Swiss-Prot record:
Domain DOG1 per the UniProt entry, residue ranges: 236-455
Lineage: Eukaryota, Viridiplantae, Streptophyta, Embryophyta, Tracheophyta
SMART domains: BRLZ (SM00338)
Self-association state and partner proteins as the record states: Homodimer. Binds DNA as a dimer. Interacts with floral glutaredoxins GRXC7/ROXY1 and GRXC8/ROXY2 in the nucleus. Interacts with TGA1, TGA2, TGA3, TGA4, TGA5, TGA6, TGA7, TGA9 and PAN.
Region called Basic motif, residue ranges: 161-181
Tissue occurrence: Expressed at low levels in inflorescence apex and flowers.
Gene from which the chain derives: TGA10
Ranges of biased composition (kind: Basic and acidic residues): 138-162
The keyword Coiled coil appears for this protein: no
Occurrences of domain bZIP (ranges): 159-203
A Pfam family it matches: DOG1
Top-level taxonomic group: Eukaryota
Protein name: Transcription factor TGA10
Length: 460
């Protein structure tokens, strides 16, 4: 019993000495437990040759042998640790700091680490290679916060007024995209038509085209002037072909507008069809402006119209005031404000028509006076003086005749303004019925002309 107590006391003293020795090694920054087991085998072999005074006790030798048996065998001798144990890692890495600060002190087993040290090494090694869980949790928490903030940005109000306003905004955005798409398609179709028209003009001027059984743009001349059917120029013939295409496109657009009106579409959707028809009419105004610069007589004569339409022709087109009378009965019921606006528009349109008619009449009278000779020259008068008098009168008449183009352009401008001002006074559905009524009016005039030309004729 006393021997056992003495051995235990000797073991504690040896442990304290070893602990102080371990602290000394910890201060130097290295741990003897990190030394390769081969070194312990070497030192153990040297211990058998030491004098008996320095030989370790049997109990110490037993613990050393047990620790060596628990360490895994290795084939290399690595007496230097992977990194100094006393170096503190940077504060940014929390998990590495915790693993480094676990500097094991010497255990009571002597100069070697206890049996629990290998498990500690394995635990630290696994913690070193294990990905940081804190950053993942922080990232997940940040994602949850981001989702919460994004959910917070989405209005979750149950107010009916707010929900209705949001629905209206979405519907308006959708209609805006549809209008933009239709506008782009219209621009593309206009570009294609313009390219085709330019190609036809070049082909008509270079090769000549057949129109109504006669050659246009070729070498047919009369008095040094190129002629076609009815003495029209090549530009006028191209305008007639383009006008025929315009009529076909107008019929297609009106059919779409009629279907849209019958389907009871919304105001925004119906507005798209109305704007398309108005833009198509503006295209005709541009075509007439181009041909007016080259052959204004073709527009005034109405050669591009049907016979029944020529009876109502006024300065190369229809009278705007007559169109207002046609559509008034087709767009009822009207409000009091609309009736007042339409009456005022009709009165101002009639005044403008009267002013243009008086101006054109004055121009015709002046033109007639310019070409009338003051007196007939005598039969014995020489030809050159008579020819010079003729050329002076023709030059004066040409200067006055150039104003005829301005009258036609002003009349087309009045027609354009009347239609657009009338549409401003009406609702979208009334505008649609207005366009359909005008188209039906001209369609009946064209049908009347066809019936007149196809009527049976009596001989004699």
């Amino acid at each position: 019993m006393q021997g056992h107590h003495q051995n235990h006391h000797q073991h504690l003293s040896s442990s304290s000495a070893t602990s102080s020795h371990g602290n000394f090694m910890n201060k130097d920054g290295y741990d003897i437990g990190e030394i390769d087991p081969s070194l312990f085998l070497y030192l153990d072999g040297q211990g058998h040759h030491d004098p008996p005074s320095t030989a370790p006790s049997p109990l110490h030798h037993h613990h050393t042998t047990q620790n060596l048996a628990m360490r895994p065998p290795t084939s290399t001798l690595n007496i230097f640790p992977s990194q100094p144990m006393h170096i503190e890692p940077p504060p940014s890495s929390t998990h590495n700091t915790d693993n480094t600060r676990l500097v094991p002190a010497a255990q009571p087993s002597g100069s070697t680490r206890p049996a629990s040290d290998p498990s500690m090494d394995l635990t630290n090694h696994s913690q070193f290679h294990q990905p940081p869980q804190g950053s993942k949790s922080i990232k997940k928490e940040g994602n949850r916060k981001g989702l919460a903030s994004s959910d917070h940005d989405i209005p979750k109000s149950s107010d009916p007024k707010t929900l209705r306003r949001l629905a209206q905004n979405r519907e308006a955005a959708r209609k805006s995209r549809l209008r933009k798409k239709a506008y782009v398609q219209q621009l593309e179709s206009c570009r294609i038509k313009l390219t085709q028209l330019e190609q036809e003009i070049q082909r008509a001027r270079s090769q000549g085209v057949f129109f109504g059984g006669s050659l246009i743009g070729g070498d047919q001349q009369q008095g040094g002037l190129p002629i076609g059917p009815g003495n029209i120029s090549s530009e006028a013939a191209v305008f007639d072909m383009e006008y025929a295409r315009w009529l076909e496109e107008q019929q297609r657009l009106l059919n779409e507008l009629r279907v849209a009106t019958q389907e009871h579409l919304s105001e925004n959707e119906l507005r798209m069809f109305v704007d398309t028809c108005l833009a198509h009419y503006d295209h005709l105004i541009n075509l007439k402006a181009m041909v007016a610069k080259t052959d204004v007589f073709h527009l005034i004569s109405g050669a591009w119209k049907t016979p029944a339409e020529r009876c109502f022709l006024w300065m190369g087109g229809f009278r705007p005031s007559e169109i207002i009378k046609v559509i008034v009965n087709q767009i009822e019921p009207l409000t009091e404000q609309q009736i007042v606006g339409i009456c005022g528009l009709q009165q101002s349109t009639q005044e403008a028509e009267e002013a243009l008619s008086q101006g054109l009449e004055a121009l015709n009278q002046s033109l007639s006076d310019s070409i009338v000779s003051d007196s007939l020259p005598p039969a014995s008068a020489p030809l050159p003086p008579h020819l010079s008098n003729f050329m002076s009168h023709m030059s004066l008449a040409l200067n006055k005749l150039s104003a005829l183009e301005g009258f036609v352009l002003q009349a087309d401008n009045l027609r354009h303004q009347t239609i657009h001002r009338l549409n401003q006074l009406l609702t979208t559905r009334q505008e649609a019925r207005c366009l359909l009524a005008v188209a039906e009016y001209f369609h009946r005039l064209q049908a009347l002309s066809s019936l007149w030309l196809a009527r049976p004729r009596q001989d004699g």
